[in-house]
């Protein structure tokens, strides 16, 4: 029943405004092709309060961390990582590097088929022209064994630059992403 005009229908939207419960809007999605070593999101609109990347990834060789760069800039990135695997915890820091390094986010190519690393990456104040850009990542992967680099990680980083972010390049230590890899960029209202 339409609340606007009283029309009866099997569709709950007949005569009513569409209902959109999400604060997230899809901007772009990329899927690995087995040969690309970098995936770039370009022409990012400056109309959101922040950005979120949702990642499921696997490398064709080796594994462990996503590298991230903004606007093609190769300087001014600092990252801190805390990771654990159930037996031990590790803390790492990288200062003034050419990338943000986000650990525990890319599954190893030697692991069982269809095992992927998962990560949620939040990019704050991306459209600001007065603030440096901060990033938070929660990631994990598990091969159900005692393999190296499995576990969970919390990473935080900063790009020391006040430019608005209009492109994001994602890599993985120089190796390519498999065809099962997906990166989805969302704008947060």
Place the predicted regions along the sequence by residue.
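Surface-exposed molecular-recognition determinants
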Residues: 2-189
């Amino acid at each position: 029943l339409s609340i606007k005009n009283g029309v009866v229908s099997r569709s709950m939207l007949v005569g009513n405004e569409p209902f959109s419960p999400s604060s997230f809007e899809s901007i772009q999605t990329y899927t690995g092709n087995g040969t690309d070593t970098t995936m770039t999101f370009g022409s990012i609109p400056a109309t959101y309060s922040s950005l979120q990347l949702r990642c499921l990834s696997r490398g064709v060789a080796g594994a462990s961390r996503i590298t991230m760069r903004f606007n093609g800039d190769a300087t001014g990135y600092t990252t801190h990582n805390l990771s654990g695997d159930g037996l031990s915890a590790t803390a790492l820091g990288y200062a003034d590097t050419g990338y943000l390094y986000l650990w525990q986010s890319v599954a190893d190519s030697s692991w069982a088929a269809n095992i992927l690393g998962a990560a949620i990456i939040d990019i704050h104040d991306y459209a600001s022209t007065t603030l440096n850009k901060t990033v938070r990542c929660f990631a994990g992967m598990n091969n159900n064994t005692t393999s190296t680099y499995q576990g969970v990680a919390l990473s935080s980083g900063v790009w020391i630059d006040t430019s608005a972010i209009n492109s994001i390049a994602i890599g993985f230590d120089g190796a390519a992403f498999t065809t099962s890899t997906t990166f989805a960029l969302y704008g947060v209202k």
